């Protein structure tokens, strides 16, 4: 190959995917999201793979693959690799840092996790900083840094008072510490602000049982069952009601 022709070929490769390829990748990415919403992880994985065939540098597709690996297939090492690949492609990708952080935390690496949460929070463009703050708070608490952990959780909720995950985790921590009054307040807010979430009413019901509030527990278990509509998520609520008979 002549030097001039080789230079032209290299220049063409350096430009990356064409506009058509980028559009194709975007379409497959959107189809993957639809598959995830329908509870079809294998279909989602196939669409993410097609997105990456069209655009190998699509960080969102790698993060999506990570979510499928972690939550759909339980393949945690593969999920970690995908999150890291997404970050490699886009170092300021806050959502990928947060997802990697929560995976590191759940696999017993809280110190590494906190670094990832801090990376997520370093970006002014992160759309959901309260999520990383809540996750960081839980990691700090798990490390034995109780005050720091609770401070992060409160900071999370000061930013997003209606964040269901934050209310849940703070409420459960307080419950486990034996602070029933404070726990009931947090879990009550969780159930009120996240009324359509089955778990919110389950957690409140169980806390009310611990507090000896039988009538309140029964009402929460009944609301939980009403929302579950026969799904497996309502089994714990059904068992709770049976205990109150």
Model regions and ranges:
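Position-specific recognition of the canonical hydrophobic site in helix A of tetratricopeptide repeat
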Residues: 36, 63, 70-71, 98, ...
